Amino acid sequence: MCFTVNGEMQLTPDTAAFLAMLFDFPFAFTKDLQPGGINHQMRDFTPGERFETDINRLCPPADTAVIRAAQRNIHQCKNGINKALRSAQGQPEYAFNDQHSRDGKVRIALRSAS
């Protein structure tokens, strides 16, 4: 089996520009970050508090005119955030579990499905 390599193959300019652009960044993009910033922000946020934000700031400028005219309910945002931050809680399911014994009798016991 014989392989040949084309020595005249050219790379696309996008690849070279991408590598040169990332060359000046510090390792793992850690420049000017707060080491405990996320922990402080999450500790200050409690799901029971009112959650208010400027929705216009989160949208592109073309969409902000439409949102300014709309009615916004803060409780909808709060409930959505609370649902997203809540961990999954297993609900116990009770099903009948048939257990046959050696004496010919059938015993029915409740079990929790996990």
Curated annotation (Swiss-Prot):
It comes from the Bacteria. Keywords: Transposable element. May be associated with transposition functions of transposon Tn903. This is Uncharacterized 12.7 kDa protein in transposon Tn903. It comes from Escherichia coli.
